[in-house]
Amino acid sequence: MDILNKCNARCKYCLTGQANRTGYSSRFPAYYMDVPTFDRLARHMLDHQIMTPDALFHIYNWYEPTLNPHLAGILNYMREHGLRVDMSTNAGRCMDFSGLGDCGHMESILFSMPGFSQSSYDRIHGFDFEQVKQNICTTMKELRQRGFKGDAYINFHLYQFNLGEIYGAKAFADSVGLRLHSIFAYFNGSGEFEPYLRGTLSAEEMKDATREIFFGHLYELEKHAEKYLEQFVEPESITLSEFCNVIPGRGCNDESKVCSIFDLHSYEEVKAVYDSLAAKRGNDPIYRQIHLWAHSYKLSMNHLFGIPD
């Protein structure tokens, strides 16, 4: 789920990044979920047994949680109510740590990186690379001082232009006490997934993408689809927008909302929503391919560089 509707990055192959690049995102006023709203959400899902008490909140999907001025309050609330949480950040900025309490309840924190040079950051995120590194160091120092002992790692997005940078990223990760996880970058909800797989992506878009993204591993995913489908199995989950609307999955934002979670009053009602969405997709094999590609982030590519996981 998201807790705001803004991101500060300009990722080329991301739904939100493209909206930032085109100016589309500027049409919408900033919204920041506050603690009372999160309290209402958590209580609703617990009271109606939509989620179990040990459910894990992933408080990120499309937007950058550190931009929410209520982030510390939400994390404090989760600790006080025994809720599990993990978080992802692009480290373009640091959250306000001043009101943050003990962080022993945080399961993990992930730092997304599109490379390890200013050149790579200029092409994708658009941040000051040195500032990003400093923000990562500051974040880990602040969290560890507050009792964080969870999994902390860099999610290194592999592009054709940044392969030689992974060793620098590994050295940096080691110096900060982080794990390194490398993945092939992919179309992230930005609309090219299906056209690429159906062969309808425009020649210009294809030319641009093939300069930067890797595609060869897609044939491996499809060739051994059953193996990877089994490997990618997850616990049941709900995907919510920042406005507490149920959305079809992690590849969608609030513009694809189905209904408000507050209109659903049982696990069975939520399951019926997702079963209905699955039925509408039918058995078109393209959706299996999209699922495989979108979940390939679970596969570490460290072995290609002789780097242990």
Language-model features: locations:
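Conserved SAM/AdoMet-binding glycine-rich loop
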Residues: 6-9, 16-20, 35-115
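Radical SAM enzyme [4Fe-4S]-AdoMet core and its adjacent flexible, acidic
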Residues: 2, 17-39, 72-76, 81, ...
